[in-house]
């Protein structure tokens, strides 16, 4: 069994792009040393390319990284990744549940049927996240740090309270009659509401083990959650007012560092400067 020495061993799913990559960048910029497992699905070269970019951006960093092939929608992939991490390290200090899917637009483009889009979105954002966490949780309990952390990534669109209050024009009542106007991002929004319950439950389950559990809402970021069409998706999000993903990466890195530890219990969804209503 190998060890990363004094470095904080941190696994970030979906870390080759988007918020996951921006979180890795933010950690590489810190003076504290991290050893980051750059999780990616598909081809391991995606993680290797991301690591090469990290090393290019931060040549003097004390942190290191290695690729980890993991697709949280696959039980086999989760099991293989767990076996790899368990054999090489035997523990984890930080887990960031970043991998996610937003496939609502795939319906309007004709790539997926509604059922396919809903099933795949929930499979990643809810089922996959739960099964991945369930598998890797024992490694957090074996952490070499005093305060292991488990982080979930929710969305501002997941708040049922804000939906009920009509706090956004998107929640305005629909006109009478049929057909109704399209409901935007409902598969994604509802899946993140489901994720909120998972995060709250893990906070309860791990409370007496000393694992700090966070559920963070990083804001509307110009990330690509869908697939290899991410660049076009990012352009569309910017046009709608999305902020740079690096802002979310800094927020997540602050949580990793422990700057929001006092907010870990009772369970809540954390925005950058406030608590997000359930």
From Swiss-Prot:
Pathway: Secondary metabolite biosynthesis; terpenoid biosynthesis. NADP(+) binds at residues 19, 71, 98, 188, 192, 223. One of its GO terms (molecular function) is oxidoreductase activity, acting on NAD(P)H, oxygen as acceptor. The keyword NADP applies. Its EC number is 1.1.1.-. Short-chain dehydrogenase/reductase; part of the gene cluster that mediates the biosynthesis of eupenifeldin, a bistropolone meroterpenoid that acts as an antitumor agent. The first step of eupenifeldin biosynthesis is the biosynthesis of 3-methylorcinaldehyde performed by the non-reducing polyketide synthase eupA. Oxidative dearomatization of 3-methylorcinaldehyde likely catalyzed by the FAD-dependent monooxygenase eupB is followed by oxidative ring expansion by the 2-oxoglutarate-dependent dioxygenase eupC to provide the first tropolone metabolite, tropolone stipitaldehyde. This is Short-chain dehydrogenase/reductase eupG.
């Amino acid at each position: 069994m190998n060890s990363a020495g004094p470095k904080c061993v941190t696994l970030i799913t979906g870390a080759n792009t988007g918020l996951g990559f921006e979180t890795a960048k933010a950690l590489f910029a810190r003076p504290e040393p991290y050893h980051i497992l750059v999780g990616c699905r598909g081809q391991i070269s995606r993680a290797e390319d991301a690591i090469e970019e990290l090393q290019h951006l931060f040549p003097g960093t004390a942190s290191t990284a290695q690729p980890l092939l993991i697709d949280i929608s696959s039980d086999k992939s989760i099991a293989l990744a767990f076996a790899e991490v368990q054999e090489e390290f035997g523990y984890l200090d930080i887990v960031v549940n970043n991998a996610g899917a937003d496939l609502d637009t795939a319906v309007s483009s004709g790539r997926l049927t509604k059922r396919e889009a809903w099933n795949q979105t929930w499979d990643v954002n809810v089922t996959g996240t739960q099964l991945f966490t369930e598998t890797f949780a024992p490694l957090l309990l074996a952490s070499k740090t005093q305060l292991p952390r488990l982080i979930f990534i929710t969305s501002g669109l997941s708040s049922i309270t804000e939906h009920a209050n009509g706090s956004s024009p998107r929640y305005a009542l629909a006109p009478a009659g049929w057909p109704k106007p399209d409901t935007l991002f409902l598969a994604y929004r509802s899946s993140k509401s489901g994720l909120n319950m998972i995060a709250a439950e893990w906070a309860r389950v791990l409370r007496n083990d000393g694992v700090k559990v966070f559920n963070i809402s990083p804001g509307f970021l110009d990330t690509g959650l869908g697939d290899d069409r991410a660049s076009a998706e990012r352009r569309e999000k910017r046009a709608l007012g999305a902020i740079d993903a690096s802002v979310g990466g800094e927020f997540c890195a602050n949580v990793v560092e422990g700057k929001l530890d006092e907010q870990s219990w009772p369970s809540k969804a954390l925005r950058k400067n406030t608590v997000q209503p359930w």
